[in-house]
Curated annotation (Swiss-Prot):
It holds the Pfam family Pyr_redox_2. One of its GO terms (molecular function) is oxidoreductase activity, acting on iron-sulfur proteins as donors, NAD or NADP as acceptor. This is Nitric oxide reductase FlRd-NAD(+) reductase. One of at least two accessory proteins for anaerobic nitric oxide (NO) reductase. Reduces the rubredoxin moiety of NO reductase. It catalyses: 2 reduced [nitric oxide reductase rubredoxin domain] + NAD(+) + H(+) = 2 oxidized [nitric oxide reductase rubredoxin domain] + NADH. It comes from Escherichia coli O127:H6 (strain E2348/69 / EPEC). Disulfide bonds: none annotated. Its EC number is 1.18.1.-. Belongs to the FAD-dependent oxidoreductase family.
Amino acid sequence: MSNGIVIIGSGFAARQLVKNIRKQDASIPLTLIAADSMDEYNKPDLSHVISQGQRADDLTRQTAGEFAEQFNLRLFPHTWVTDIDAEAHVVKSQNNQWQYDKLVLATGASAFVPPVPGRELMLTLNSQQEYRACETQLRDARRVLIVGGGLIGSELAMDFCRAGKMVTLIDNAASILASLMPPEVSSRLQHRLTEMGVHLLLKSQLQGLEKTNSGILATLDRQRSIEVDTVIAATGLRPETALARRAGLTINRGVCVDSYLQTSNADIYALGDCAEINGQVLPFLQPIQLSAMVLAKNLLGNNTPLKLPAMLVKIKTPELPLHLAGETQRQDLRWQINTERQGMVARGVDDADQLRAFVVSEDRMKEAFGLLKTLSM
């Protein structure tokens, strides 16, 4: 490979790929291009920065320069890729262009902001860069509205509450974590958040935001309103697909790839939050780690299909942490819930009494690995 591998992106997926490639080949040319600083940080830490009093710069684990030196890379930080010429094997920015033999899209996903009047007043916490832009506002805010009661929204609600702030969480659904599990399973965490002082506005809709002299007025349905100091959107992520679309690649929710992480173009691959693997978007650390291991082999000519095992998803709510696995969102499962003082084990079984999903909490999380072994895939 004379031009080597070009990777667009510098997040967790890109870094895992670099590490796996370098384990097998120390000299193949590797070029990374990204719009951010390319400094390394642990993205899940963003769910806990407020209660731990961390500044954005405190999150940095390794600078871009250290990363480049350690893994023999060419890095182009603060660089927006504008176009991909798939036929000519060229990646373009406004002032530069790069030839590639193989190209990897690791462009991640962006936070979805609900399209309501005043949406520009909402903050998002999807990167170190975003946190840096609003950390003073978040630290100084006394009244916080979190829009979205999913995984990130629930984590943030607990964190802001632990930091002593007045927290309101709003969601259209009738329970928190509604896209991940049924209400009878999430109710333990929901009750804990309420006990801590989080004001839950479920089955409720944000209709607009307006700046006032003393904060932000949030207008809700049913002629309700509340005033807060800051509003955070935690309503999910959208895979970044614009570049792939311009390159003529097949797009659905994400950039469509097969079991080899290959897109509809033989020399372009996708990895991480931007990728849709055989119809599934999997924005969690473990599938990204496993995908990076497989893709490194494929880029170096050792074709290997990705085979994902049953995997744990961790909800980092320290006052009541949860692990879950399997098809927890399936509507046809019967849930067998065992609740004790030290935690909960909820088993989701199908009509044949096969274990298809489970959720464990607190001290009973240690039972997760045993349950994983009996999970039917």
